[in-house]
């Protein structure tokens, strides 16, 4: 089943596109919750970890929904993930009345998470191709 999920004509691609759109909307919603409404956490840099995971999942889903596993697709997913993270942060800066602010550290967390999502996809696709 794993190797079927990574083929070009996979029936999972359409579902992955839907999940990618839903996940992107979830990122937008979570990133624009007013600052005072956010729960407190004792975990150091908890918000950075949240950004990291959100964008790792986003780029992984993007790759699952994508047309191929070529290097150009991997790079496109990475650029889209980084650009999406940057856009979210820019919008947070513009909408500072929500109690949110633009953070370069969040952009770094988004970008590193995006890279991890692409890497995880590549490793799983490579393993699936090896066992096929």
Residue ranges of each PLM-predicted region?
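Bulky hydrophobic segments
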Residues: 1-104, 111, 115-132
């Amino acid at each position: 089943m794993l190797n079927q999920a990574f083929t070009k004509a996979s029936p999972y691609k359409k579902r992955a596109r839907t999940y990618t759109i839903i996940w992107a909307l979830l990122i937008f919603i979570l990133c624009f919750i007013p600052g005072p409404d956010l729960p407190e956490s004792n975990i150091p840099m908890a918000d950075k970890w949240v950004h990291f995971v959100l964008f790792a999942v986003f780029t992984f889903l993007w790759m699952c929904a994508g047309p191929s596993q070529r290097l150009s697709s991997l790079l496109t997913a990475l650029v889209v993930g980084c650009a999406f993270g940057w856009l979210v942060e820019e919008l947070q800066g513009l909408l500072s009345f929500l109690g949110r602010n633009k953070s370069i550290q969040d952009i770094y967390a988004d970008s590193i998470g995006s890279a991890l999502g692409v890497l995880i996809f590549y490793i799983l696709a490579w393993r699936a191709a090896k066992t096929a």
